[in-house]
Amino acid sequence: MDSHNFPNLCLMKLSAYHKARGDTLEWHDGRKHYDLVYMSRVFTDSYSKDYSGTIHADCIIRGGTGYGLNNRLPEEVEHTCPDYTLYPKFEGTAYGFLSRGCPRGCGFCIVGEKEGRRTVAVADLAEFWRGEKEIKLLDANLLACPDWERLLQQLAQSGAMVDFTQGLDVRLITPEKVEMLNKVKTKMLHFAWDNPEDDLTGYFKRFSELTTVKDYRKRRVYVLTNYNSSHEQDLYRIYTLRDMGYDPYVMVYEKPTAPPITRKLQRWVNNKWLFRAVLDFNDFDPAGWEKRKNNRK
Protein backbone atom coordinates (compact mmCIF):
# COMPACT_ATOMS: atom_id res chain seq x y z
CA MET A 1 0.00 0.00 0.00
CA ASP A 2 1.17 3.53 -0.77
CA SER A 3 -0.20 6.88 -1.99
CA HIS A 4 -0.15 5.97 -5.73
CA ASN A 5 0.82 9.53 -6.76
CA PHE A 6 4.26 8.43 -7.95
CA PRO A 7 5.35 4.85 -8.66
CA ASN A 8 6.91 3.40 -5.53
CA LEU A 9 10.18 1.80 -6.57
CA CYS A 10 10.54 -0.32 -3.44
CA LEU A 11 7.04 -1.76 -3.79
CA MET A 12 7.66 -2.55 -7.45
CA LYS A 13 10.83 -4.44 -6.52
CA LEU A 14 9.03 -6.28 -3.72
CA SER A 15 6.23 -7.19 -6.12
CA ALA A 16 8.70 -8.65 -8.63
CA TYR A 17 10.52 -10.53 -5.88
CA HIS A 18 7.37 -12.13 -4.46
CA LYS A 19 5.89 -12.97 -7.86
CA ALA A 20 9.11 -14.79 -8.73
CA ARG A 21 8.58 -16.88 -5.58
CA GLY A 22 5.03 -17.75 -6.61
CA ASP A 23 3.29 -15.50 -4.07
CA THR A 24 -0.05 -13.83 -4.78
CA LEU A 25 -0.08 -10.03 -4.48
CA GLU A 26 -2.71 -7.28 -4.51
CA TRP A 27 -3.23 -3.77 -3.22
CA HIS A 28 -4.39 -3.69 0.37
CA ASP A 29 -8.11 -4.18 1.01
CA GLY A 30 -9.13 -3.35 4.57
CA ARG A 31 -11.84 -6.02 4.49
CA LYS A 32 -9.36 -8.84 3.94
CA HIS A 33 -6.79 -10.66 6.06
CA TYR A 34 -3.26 -11.08 4.69
CA ASP A 35 -0.18 -13.08 5.52
CA LEU A 36 1.97 -10.00 4.93
CA VAL A 37 1.34 -6.31 4.28
CA TYR A 38 4.01 -3.83 3.17
CA MET A 39 3.44 -0.17 4.04
CA SER A 40 5.57 2.47 2.32
CA ARG A 41 5.81 6.09 3.36
CA VAL A 42 8.08 8.73 1.85
CA PHE A 43 7.22 11.77 3.99
CA THR A 44 6.69 12.41 7.69
CA ASP A 45 3.60 13.99 9.26
CA SER A 46 4.68 17.45 8.06
CA TYR A 47 3.51 16.51 4.57
CA SER A 48 1.35 13.43 4.88
CA LYS A 49 -0.43 11.64 7.69
CA ASP A 50 0.24 7.98 8.27
CA TYR A 51 -2.43 5.45 7.33
CA SER A 52 -4.88 5.16 10.22
CA GLY A 53 -7.19 2.45 8.88
CA THR A 54 -7.45 -1.10 10.10
CA ILE A 55 -4.96 -3.65 8.77
CA HIS A 56 -5.63 -7.36 9.21
CA ALA A 57 -2.35 -9.19 8.70
CA ASP A 58 -0.06 -11.74 10.31
CA CYS A 59 2.87 -9.45 9.63
CA ILE A 60 3.18 -5.75 8.73
CA ILE A 61 6.45 -4.35 7.39
CA ARG A 62 6.83 -0.57 7.25
CA GLY A 63 9.49 1.07 5.11
CA GLY A 64 10.51 4.33 3.51
CA THR A 65 11.97 7.58 4.82
CA GLY A 66 8.63 8.50 6.37
CA TYR A 67 9.23 5.71 8.88
CA GLY A 68 12.95 6.33 9.36
CA LEU A 69 16.28 6.30 7.57
CA ASN A 70 17.59 2.92 8.65
CA ASN A 71 15.19 0.57 6.87
CA ARG A 72 16.66 -1.09 3.80
CA LEU A 73 15.53 -3.61 1.23
CA PRO A 74 17.37 -6.94 1.38
CA GLU A 75 20.10 -7.12 -1.28
CA GLU A 76 18.28 -9.79 -3.28
CA VAL A 77 15.25 -7.47 -3.48
CA GLU A 78 17.23 -4.27 -4.06
CA HIS A 79 18.73 -5.68 -7.24
CA THR A 80 15.49 -7.11 -8.61
CA CYS A 81 14.08 -5.54 -11.78
CA PRO A 82 10.94 -3.63 -10.71
CA ASP A 83 7.48 -4.94 -11.55
CA TYR A 84 6.20 -2.02 -13.62
CA THR A 85 2.79 -3.67 -14.07
CA LEU A 86 2.04 -2.67 -10.47
CA TYR A 87 1.24 0.82 -11.80
CA PRO A 88 -0.39 0.31 -15.22
CA LYS A 89 -0.78 4.02 -15.95
CA PHE A 90 3.00 4.49 -15.65
CA GLU A 91 3.99 1.54 -17.83
CA GLY A 92 6.47 2.40 -20.56
CA THR A 93 8.71 4.25 -18.10
CA ALA A 94 11.62 2.75 -16.16
CA TYR A 95 12.59 4.02 -12.71
CA GLY A 96 15.81 3.48 -10.84
CA PHE A 97 19.19 4.47 -9.45
CA LEU A 98 22.54 4.07 -11.15
CA SER A 99 24.31 5.66 -8.18
CA ARG A 100 23.64 6.44 -4.54
CA GLY A 101 24.95 9.04 -2.12
CA CYS A 102 25.98 12.69 -2.27
CA PRO A 103 29.08 14.48 -0.93
CA ARG A 104 27.31 17.79 -0.24
CA GLY A 105 25.71 17.05 3.15
CA CYS A 106 23.08 19.81 2.88
CA GLY A 107 21.20 20.37 6.14
CA PHE A 108 17.78 20.14 4.53
CA CYS A 109 18.52 16.87 2.71
CA ILE A 110 18.47 13.31 4.05
CA VAL A 111 20.53 11.74 1.26
CA GLY A 112 23.91 12.11 2.97
CA GLU A 113 22.69 10.45 6.15
CA LYS A 114 20.66 7.79 4.37
CA GLU A 115 22.94 6.88 1.46
CA GLY A 116 26.35 8.20 2.45
CA ARG A 117 28.56 11.22 1.73
CA ARG A 118 30.22 9.56 -1.25
CA THR A 119 28.49 8.94 -4.55
CA VAL A 120 29.05 5.38 -5.71
CA ALA A 121 27.72 3.31 -8.61
CA VAL A 122 25.17 0.75 -7.40
CA ALA A 123 23.68 -0.69 -10.60
CA ASP A 124 23.92 -0.89 -14.35
CA LEU A 125 21.02 0.39 -16.42
CA ALA A 126 20.04 -3.15 -17.45
CA GLU A 127 19.05 -3.85 -13.85
CA PHE A 128 15.88 -1.74 -14.11
CA TRP A 129 15.50 -0.94 -17.83
CA ARG A 130 14.03 -3.43 -20.29
CA GLY A 131 13.58 -1.29 -23.38
CA GLU A 132 11.07 1.23 -21.99
CA LYS A 133 10.80 4.42 -24.04
CA GLU A 134 11.45 6.66 -21.03
CA ILE A 135 13.80 6.48 -18.05
CA LYS A 136 13.29 8.47 -14.86
CA LEU A 137 16.65 8.54 -13.15
CA LEU A 138 16.45 9.04 -9.37
CA ASP A 139 20.15 9.56 -8.55
CA ALA A 140 20.87 12.37 -6.08
CA ASN A 141 24.23 13.40 -7.55
CA LEU A 142 25.24 11.35 -10.58
CA LEU A 143 27.95 13.77 -11.70
CA ALA A 144 29.79 13.24 -8.39
CA CYS A 145 30.13 9.53 -9.11
CA PRO A 146 33.61 8.40 -10.24
CA ASP A 147 31.84 6.16 -12.78
CA TRP A 148 29.80 9.01 -14.30
CA GLU A 149 31.15 8.45 -17.82
CA ARG A 150 30.30 4.75 -17.93
CA LEU A 151 26.83 5.34 -16.50
CA LEU A 152 26.02 8.22 -18.84
CA GLN A 153 27.24 6.09 -21.74
CA GLN A 154 24.69 3.43 -20.79
CA LEU A 155 21.93 6.04 -20.82
CA ALA A 156 23.07 7.35 -24.21
CA GLN A 157 23.23 3.87 -25.73
CA SER A 158 19.72 3.04 -24.50
CA GLY A 159 18.16 5.52 -26.93
CA ALA A 160 15.43 6.17 -24.35
CA MET A 161 14.26 9.62 -23.31
CA VAL A 162 15.86 10.38 -19.94
CA ASP A 163 14.50 12.56 -17.15
CA PHE A 164 17.23 13.43 -14.65
CA THR A 165 14.68 13.95 -11.89
CA GLN A 166 16.69 14.81 -8.79
CA GLY A 167 19.02 17.60 -9.81
CA LEU A 168 22.37 17.39 -11.57
CA ASP A 169 25.07 19.28 -9.65
CA VAL A 170 25.84 22.27 -11.86
CA ARG A 171 29.04 22.94 -9.86
CA LEU A 172 30.48 19.66 -11.18
CA ILE A 173 29.88 20.47 -14.84
CA THR A 174 32.91 20.08 -17.11
CA PRO A 175 33.18 20.12 -20.91
CA GLU A 176 33.72 16.34 -20.82
CA LYS A 177 30.59 15.72 -18.76
CA VAL A 178 28.45 17.98 -20.92
CA GLU A 179 29.77 16.27 -24.04
CA MET A 180 28.54 12.97 -22.65
CA LEU A 181 25.23 14.47 -21.50
CA ASN A 182 24.73 15.78 -25.04
CA LYS A 183 24.70 12.18 -26.27
CA VAL A 184 21.73 11.32 -24.04
CA LYS A 185 18.22 11.82 -25.38
CA THR A 186 17.01 14.25 -22.75
CA LYS A 187 13.41 14.69 -21.74
CA MET A 188 14.26 16.91 -18.76
CA LEU A 189 17.33 18.17 -16.95
CA HIS A 190 16.95 19.18 -13.32
CA PHE A 191 19.42 21.30 -11.40
CA ALA A 192 19.17 23.02 -8.01
CA TRP A 193 20.08 26.41 -6.57
CA ASP A 194 19.39 25.82 -2.90
CA ASN A 195 21.70 28.19 -1.05
CA PRO A 196 21.30 31.89 -1.88
CA GLU A 197 24.81 32.53 -0.54
CA ASP A 198 26.23 30.42 -3.38
CA ASP A 199 26.60 32.40 -6.60
CA LEU A 200 25.95 29.78 -9.25
CA THR A 201 25.39 32.14 -12.17
CA GLY A 202 28.78 31.38 -13.71
CA TYR A 203 28.13 27.64 -13.61
CA PHE A 204 24.72 27.98 -15.22
CA LYS A 205 26.08 30.27 -17.92
CA ARG A 206 28.87 27.81 -18.64
CA PHE A 207 26.42 24.95 -18.99
CA SER A 208 24.27 27.01 -21.38
CA GLU A 209 27.29 27.54 -23.61
CA LEU A 210 28.15 23.83 -23.75
CA THR A 211 24.81 22.02 -23.82
CA THR A 212 22.75 21.14 -26.87
CA VAL A 213 19.59 21.37 -24.73
CA LYS A 214 18.48 24.91 -25.52
CA ASP A 215 14.76 24.70 -24.68
CA TYR A 216 14.29 26.40 -21.30
CA ARG A 217 11.38 24.05 -20.57
CA LYS A 218 13.85 21.15 -20.44
CA ARG A 219 16.25 23.02 -18.12
CA ARG A 220 14.45 23.13 -14.79
CA VAL A 221 16.09 24.39 -11.60
CA TYR A 222 14.79 23.68 -8.12
CA VAL A 223 14.86 26.83 -5.97
CA LEU A 224 14.69 26.07 -2.25
CA THR A 225 12.76 28.59 -0.15
CA ASN A 226 11.86 28.94 3.54
CA TYR A 227 15.33 27.69 4.45
CA ASN A 228 17.83 30.41 5.41
CA SER A 229 16.78 32.73 2.60
CA SER A 230 14.94 36.03 2.41
CA HIS A 231 12.15 36.83 -0.02
CA GLU A 232 14.53 39.11 -1.89
CA GLN A 233 17.07 36.30 -2.23
CA ASP A 234 14.37 33.99 -3.51
CA LEU A 235 13.31 36.52 -6.13
CA TYR A 236 16.91 37.11 -7.19
CA ARG A 237 17.49 33.43 -7.92
CA ILE A 238 14.18 33.13 -9.76
CA TYR A 239 14.67 36.20 -11.95
CA THR A 240 18.33 35.36 -12.64
CA LEU A 241 17.54 31.81 -13.72
CA ARG A 242 14.74 32.94 -16.01
CA ASP A 243 16.98 35.57 -17.57
CA MET A 244 19.66 32.93 -18.24
CA GLY A 245 17.23 30.63 -20.04
CA TYR A 246 16.32 28.22 -17.24
CA ASP A 247 12.96 27.26 -15.79
CA PRO A 248 12.88 27.83 -12.01
CA TYR A 249 10.68 25.66 -9.83
CA VAL A 250 10.06 26.69 -6.23
CA MET A 251 10.45 24.09 -3.48
CA VAL A 252 9.21 25.12 -0.02
CA TYR A 253 11.00 23.63 2.97
CA GLU A 254 8.61 22.69 5.79
CA LYS A 255 5.71 24.20 3.87
CA PRO A 256 3.32 24.40 6.87
CA THR A 257 5.71 26.96 8.42
CA ALA A 258 6.19 29.05 5.26
CA PRO A 259 4.96 32.67 5.26
CA PRO A 260 2.11 33.59 2.90
CA ILE A 261 4.42 35.47 0.54
CA THR A 262 6.51 32.34 -0.02
CA ARG A 263 3.42 30.29 -0.79
CA LYS A 264 2.29 33.01 -3.17
CA LEU A 265 5.72 32.93 -4.81
CA GLN A 266 5.49 29.18 -5.31
CA ARG A 267 2.05 29.52 -6.85
CA TRP A 268 3.30 32.14 -9.30
CA VAL A 269 6.52 30.41 -10.37
CA ASN A 270 5.22 26.85 -10.58
CA ASN A 271 2.19 27.76 -12.69
CA LYS A 272 4.20 28.06 -15.87
CA TRP A 273 1.53 29.87 -17.84
CA LEU A 274 1.26 32.53 -15.13
CA PHE A 275 5.02 32.78 -14.73
CA ARG A 276 5.47 33.59 -18.40
CA ALA A 277 2.43 35.86 -18.61
CA VAL A 278 3.19 37.90 -15.47
CA LEU A 279 6.85 38.82 -15.60
CA ASP A 280 7.04 40.68 -12.27
CA PHE A 281 6.01 39.00 -9.02
CA ASN A 282 4.68 42.31 -7.71
CA ASP A 283 2.11 42.28 -10.51
CA PHE A 284 0.81 38.84 -9.59
CA ASP A 285 -2.67 39.04 -8.06
CA PRO A 286 -3.87 35.53 -7.13
CA ALA A 287 -7.45 36.64 -6.53
CA GLY A 288 -7.58 38.46 -9.84
CA TRP A 289 -6.21 35.52 -11.81
CA GLU A 290 -8.59 33.13 -10.07
CA LYS A 291 -11.50 35.40 -11.00
CA ARG A 292 -10.37 35.52 -14.64
CA LYS A 293 -10.07 31.73 -14.73
CA ASN A 294 -13.58 31.29 -13.37
CA ASN A 295 -14.98 33.79 -15.88
CA ARG A 296 -13.52 31.77 -18.76
CA LYS A 297 -15.38 28.63 -17.68
Segments from the language model and where they lie:
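A short helix->loop->beta-strand "cap" motif at the edges of active sites that frequently abuts
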Residues: I55-G63, A160, D215-R217, Y246
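Anion (oxyanion) recognition and catalysis
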Residues: K19, A156, Y239-D243
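Canonical Radical SAM [4Fe-4S] cluster-binding loop centered on the CxxxCxxC motif
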Residues: C10, K89-A126
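A general structural detector for well-ordered alpha-helical segments in enzyme core domains, enriched
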Residues: L14, K49-H56, L151, E176-M180, ...
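Ser/Thr/Gly-rich flexible loops in soluble cytosolic domains mediating phosphotransfer, phosphorylation
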Residues: D58-T85
